[in-house]
């Protein structure tokens, strides 16, 4: 998916990152329409792009594969009715609180990230932002992306962020005991 006038692209993950030139069968069918925010030329000659996800999509059909993959997609729209439910609100609140705890307890994450998390107003943006920045396998991130609805995505995000927080606490506890010995 590409729209040159709006600098948007379709982003999908590969099932196996070792495949150099993936075919349509080597890609997950769920992806994200993303806006290109910045294109960076790296010192090693490679190019990196900074993107912001806008909405989810599902690949329906291959249109062409040269010079790049071109596909027909179906946009996946959020059901905003769920966002008003109290369980959903509490789940989002828990995600935000746990993300802030991880930031505060992990010396490798800049403290400004806590400010950024606290100031995200959109529930779906928070869930997507936290999910994309967690240290998860591509397969686990794909599970979150492929969830049927925003409530299910929020619960999966909370499950994974709680596991990440438990690992961080255990790691910090081990390092503290080693220092004290």
Language model regions located:
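N-terminal low-complexity, acidic/polar interaction/targeting segments
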Residues: 1-181
């Amino acid at each position: 998916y590409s729209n040159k006038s709006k600098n948007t692209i379709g982003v999908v993950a590969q099932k196996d990152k070792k495949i150099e030139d993936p075919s349509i069968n080597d890609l997950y069918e769920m992806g994200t329409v993303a806006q290109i925010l910045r294109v960076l030329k790296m010192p090693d000659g490679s190019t990196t792009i900074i993107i912001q996800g806008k909405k989810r999509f599902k690949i329906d059909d291959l249109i062409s594969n040269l010079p790049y993959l071109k596909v027909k997609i179906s946009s996946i729209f959020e059901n905003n009715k769920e966002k008003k439910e109290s369980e959903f609100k509490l789940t989002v609140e828990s995600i935000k609180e746990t993300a802030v705890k991880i930031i505060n307890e992990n010396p490798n994450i800049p403290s400004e990230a806590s400010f950024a998390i606290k100031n995200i107003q959109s529930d779906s943006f928070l869930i997507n932002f936290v999910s994309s920045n967690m240290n998860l396998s591509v397969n686990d991130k794909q599970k979150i992306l492929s969830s049927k609805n925003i409530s299910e995505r929020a619960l999966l995000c909370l499950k994974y962020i709680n596991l990440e927080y438990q690992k961080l606490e255990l790691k910090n506890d081990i390092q503290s005991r080693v220092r004290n010995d």
